């Protein structure tokens, strides 16, 4: 039987600080045994002068700081934050269906960036990085936008869409960078960092 390439993590209880079902699935797909945890009162604000492409890493670091005093020496915690940046505007999760439609109209026919900030921390060490993926959206009709927003779950996703859902199949004409980053965790980069612990 072959050894898991991430067996170096066996000395830790790995914690994923996220409620995202996509992040949980992606980390499991990477072969990591972990437990999900989530604090409900983490301040995810950021200074107004933060460059749009740095917002996700700033928020991921704030999440790591919120957990830093709570982890023990045998624990490793992963935090992440994903945003969509279009025309210099940061798009988080939509407030409601109307907001989701507004976001998708903004993305329609344009190239945007999906940025995920990630931290991996133990009691004595923190590694932080961000991944950026360029995503090209085809021109979407109002009917396509309404179909997606009323039949799928855009409200729990940055930029109001999931690349793995119908809109990704029908509306995304190209990507440059990590596909998994668009889903919420840049797995290759995360694997490389986890291998170093």
Predicted regions located by residue number:
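Short, glycine/serine-rich, charged loops/turns that create anion-binding
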Residues: 21, 41, 187
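A short linear boundary/processing microfeature
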Residues: 32-33, 43, 110, 151
